[in-house]
Regions:
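N-terminal small-domain helix-loop-helix segment of the aminotransferase-like
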Residues: 2-94, 276-278, 385-389, 405-408
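Helix C-cap/helix->beta junction micro-motif
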Residues: 24, 128, 186-190, 305, ...
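Conserved PLP-anchoring active-site segment centered on the Schiff-base-forming lysine
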Residues: 106-125
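Hydrophobic residues in well-ordered beta-strands that form the structural core
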Residues: 113, 134, 194-196, 345-347
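Active-site phosphate-binding strand-loop segment of PLP-dependent enzymes
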Residues: 139-207
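PLP-dependent enzyme catalytic core of the Aspartate aminotransferase-like
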Residues: 155, 336-344, 351-408
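Conserved core segment of the aminotransferase class I/II
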Residues: 218-289, 299-302, 384, 398-399
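Conserved glycine-rich beta-strand-loop-beta hairpin in the small C-terminal domain of fold type I
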Residues: 273, 289-299, 309-322, 358
């Protein structure tokens, strides 16, 4: 009674590793949780207070989202990109993941996914019956596709519609896309649109934020939400910015929304206004300072002749490749690490890499972000002593990984 395409799917890898880690902890085992990509920081206090004030909100809100919320999101995106966006171009959903799913179902064409890509892009394509294509990338290109590789794929059948999904900063690599302008030139030439997943865009470390919407806004759907920069993953609030040129897609998504989630939780939407309306720059600066310090600590202490990876540029991920490990699959390798060292990381296979490539995703978020943030100032230097004091599992997990690499 189950469709074959659904039978072959597994639980989302990120959620699955979180459940496995929790089950091991419930059995009394200490697990270093480098597998689940959840923000370690608390939701800003002002936003929490707004949720308390709006707990009484009980009515269904507009399918597209509360107008006042869409208004502040439009202002936020307009300021961020130095472009004019309107509330009518915003659609709010119960997490950007759900909106991506509705987009996959609405879109009549084929999906282009860089290797690596976030774990849910491909399964959503399968569920929606959209053919998908993987595009290989390299560490030298920050794990993003070149404009030439995208064009080469499109030219195999340039009469089809294509949707390219770009995620910068990237999950799982922690890298930032540097060739957006070159990619945009290809986008403008062919029947292709872009989903720009910008959920980590407030967490870029050393470079200025840039969106492909700055180069081809008429063909770019921007995706964002509260889960990463605002620490509100469990609140489930995301949004799309859809250009007027793609109104048909927006209207189709509204129809699907009306037949699925109806509207996002009313208290959450009212509270979210303050997330975009109030200045949270100190909160974001401290978040980035901590994440950058921790990411660079893990990078410098784990990198070796046997472990290669790019230095993190944003978000909270590293993508180490273990050159001296000879397992049949990266999944087997991660199971070995969990069994021997109680460190949970995700195999690169879940992100589109060949199963025999010993590459992984490491999420350096296993610490109490609220406590850490409360102990630092804007000018505090994040050193090993601070990390050891307020993020001990980061130190412990890195040492266990090094020991596993060197001895096993």
């Amino acid at each position: 009674m189950i469709k074959n395409k659904i039978k072959n799917l597994d639980l989302s890898a990120t959620l699955k590793i979180n459940e496995i880690s929790k089950n091991l902890e419930n059995d009394g085992k200490e697990v270093i949780k480098f597998g689940f990509g959840q923000s370690p920081f608390q939701v800003p206090d002002q936003v929490v207070e707004e949720l308390k004030k709006n707990a009484h909100q009980k009515s269904y809100l507009p399918i597209q989202g509360l107008y006042e919320l869409r208004e502040v999101i439009a202002k936020y995106e307009s300021k961020k990109k130095n472009k004019k966006f309107t509330p009518d171009q915003i659609i709010v959903g119960p997490g950007s993941k759900e909106l991506m799913f509705l987009l996959h179902i609405s879109f009549d064409g084929e999906i282009i996914l860089p290797v690596p890509s976030w774990v849910s892009y491909q399964p959503q394509s399968i569920i929606a019956d959209n053919k998908f294509h993987w595009i290989e990338t390299s560490a030298n290109d920050n794990w993003y596709p070149t404009a030439e590789s995208i064009e080469k794929l499109i030219l195999k059948d340039k009469d089809k519609n294509y949707l390219l999904i770009l995620n910068s900063p990237n999950n799982p690599s922690g890298q930032v896309c540097k060739n957006l302008e070159e990619i945009s030139k290809i986008i403008k030439k062919y029947k292709i649109i872009v989903l720009s997943d910008e959920i980590y865009s407030e967490l870029i470390f050393n470079v200025n934020y840039e969106s492909i919407a700055n180069y081809c806004s008429e063909k770019t759907i921007v995706s964002n939400g509260l889960s990463k920069w605002c620490g509100a993953g469990g609140w489930r609030l995301g949004y799309f910015v859809i250009p007027n040129e793609l109104n048909q897609l927006k209207n189709s998504m509204k129809v699907l929304a009306s037949e699925t989630f109806s509207a996002v939780s009313a208290p959450i939407q009212f509270a979210a206004i303050s997330a975009f309306e109030i200045d949270h720059s100190d909160y974001i600066t401290k978040s980035k300072k901590i994440l950058k310090g921790i990411g660079e600590y893990v990078y410098h202490n784990l990198k070796s002749n046997n472990v290669i990876m790019n230095k993190p540029m944003g978000g909270f991920y590293l993508m180490p490749e273990f050159l001296n490990k000879k397992f049949k699959t990266s999944t087997d390798m991660c199971s070995d690490l969990l069994n021997k060292k109680s460190v949970a990381i995700l195999p690169g296979f879940d992100f589109g890499f060949p199963k025999d490539k010993m590459i992984t995703r490491l999420s350096y978020t296993d610490f109490d972000g609220k406590n850490f943030m409360s102990k630092i100032n804007l000018d505090t230097s994040i050193d090993e002593d601070l990390i050891n004091k307020y993020a001990p599992n980061i130190i412990k997990g890195t040492k266990r990984l090094k020991d596993w690499v060197e001895k096993d």
